[in-house]
Amino acid sequence: MNPMIEFCVSNLAHGSQEARAILEKDPNLDVLEYGCLSYCGTCMESLFALVNGEVVMGETPAELVENIYTFIEENPMF
């Protein structure tokens, strides 16, 4: 079972699309997009994604990708 990375379409429009494009190239991740993840305050503040149900944020797409991989390393699923 791969880690699940979920993006909000509104946050993609705010800049996290670049992070999504990078993460989608990793065959060890399941990357999904939803209309809304109901994290509107977080969405307005910074780029974010849900990683296995937990919020991970970054100020830039590169930082978001780095933070997602760090989160996955520090929180193994098994």
From Swiss-Prot:
Name of the featured protein: UPF0349 protein YuzB
Organism name: Bacillus subtilis (strain 168)
HAMAP family, A to Z: UPF0349
Family: Belongs to the UPF0349 family.
